[in-house]
Regions:
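Conserved, hydrophobic alpha-helical core segments of structured domains
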Residues: 1-104, 113
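Charged substrate- and nucleic-acid-binding regions of tRNA-handling and nucleotidyl-transfer enzymes
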Residues: 95-167
Length: 167
C-alpha cells in the first residue's frame, strides 16, 4: 500500500507491479525498474507530472516515457516493416543514445519475460554500423540539410530491408 501513498495520482495495476518485481529479480538498474513500473500507465501526462513532482532525473523521465509509448510496438518488432522499424529506432533515438536504447531493451525484458531483445539489438547495431558508413559517403557526394536527411533515410531503409530478408 506504500505505492498508493507515494504515488496517489497513479493507478498501478498488476502488470506494472509484476514488471517492477521482475526488474528487481533481474537486478536491473533503478532507471530500468522505474520505466518498467510505469510502462502501462494510461496517460503519459501522468508520468510527466510524477517525474516533475518528484524531480526525477531527465533520463528517468525520458526512458519511462519511451517505454510507455513504444513497448507494445517493440514487442512485435519482428512483424514490423522496414519503415516501421526505422520509425521506432528514430523515435527511441537509438542511433545517438545507445545506453538509453539498451535500457529500453532491458525494460522490455521485465515487461515481457519471454522477450529476447537480441534480434532487435542486432537489427539496430547493423543499421547503426552501416548507416555511419553511408553518412560519410553522402556528405562526400555534397548532400546537405533536408537532402541529406532524405538520402540517409533511403539508405537506412535499404539496409533494414536487406536485414529483414536475411533474418
Amino acid at each position: 500500500h506504500a505505492m498508493k501513498i507515494l504515488f496517489p495520482t497513479i493507478r498501478l495495476n498488476h502488470q506494472g507491479m509484476k514488471a517492477l518485481i521482475d526488474a528487481a529479480k533481474q537486478n536491473q538498474t533503478n532507471i530500468v525498474r522505474f520505466a518498467a513500473l510505469l510502462h502501462d500507465t494510461v496517460d503519459e501526462k501522468i508520468i510527466s507530472a510524477l517525474c516533475n513532482q518528484y524531480r526525477a532525473p531527465n533520463d528517468y523521465s525520458a526512458l519511462a516515457l519511451s517505454v510507455n509509448k513504444y513497448y507494445q510496438t517493440a514487442l512485435k518488432a519482428k512483424q514490423l516493416s522496414a519503415d516501421e522499424l526505422l520509425t521506432l529506432f528514430l523515435a527511441l533515438d537509438s542511433f545517438r543514445r545507445d545506453e538509453r536504447f539498451q535500457d529500453f531493451l532491458q525494460a522490455l525484458k521485465c515487461i515481457a519475460s519471454d522477450f529476447d531483445g537480441t534480434w532487435l539489438k542486432n537489427c539496430a547495431n547493423n543499421l547503426k554500423t552501416l548507416s555511419a558508413i553511408h553518412v560519410k559517403e553522402l556528405i562526400q557526394q555534397n548532400y546537405t540539410g533536408i537532402e541529406l536527411a532524405h538520402a540517409l533515410k533511403k539508405q537506412r531503409l535499404l539496409i533494414l530491408n536487406e536485414f529483414l530478408q536475411k533474418n
